[in-house]
Amino acid sequence: MSITIADDIRDWSINVLEVSNPDLPGGMSACPFARKAWLDDQVRIVECEDVLMQTILECGHFDPDQASLVICASYNLPDATELYDWTSAMNAFASKADIHVMSFHPDFGAEEAELDFLYLNEWQSSLEEPYCMMFIQSLSQVDDASLLLEDKGYYSVYPEDEYHELVIERRKRRNGYETS
């Protein structure tokens, strides 16, 4: 039986995102909400050829009551800089529909962002070929979760520029840029 991208993502979540992490305050996990989302069957993974087109399609019918997280994943890698720019543009548009999109590209990741807690681990992908991912979630749900994490000091390990880009800018989009 061959391993799918979905299998690999689930393995990554179990072994990296859901486990206690000594680099985070109080040993929190890298993604404190991941385990519950999986247990509640709130994660849907779509393996596709064109990750950008599939993300647009998934955003068009995204329903957080059906799945709080949709992951579009593909072996067909767009250029890393283009993916980053596309994600920023998509969020400017999608925020009006309470949708937030995050991207992962194997050529640009946690190491460049100095997010040690995401890459200093023993996990290895079971797949030989790299893949990219687009994460689709409710903007308000992600922002509400980040408020809870802020209270617990979660973002204290983030470099200031990453915190601003990942948390503050997202919050500004949610609030129509009324948040300073």
Predicted regions: what they are:
Residues 1-180:
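Expand to "…catalyze enediolate/carbanion chemistry for C-C bond making/breaking, isomerization
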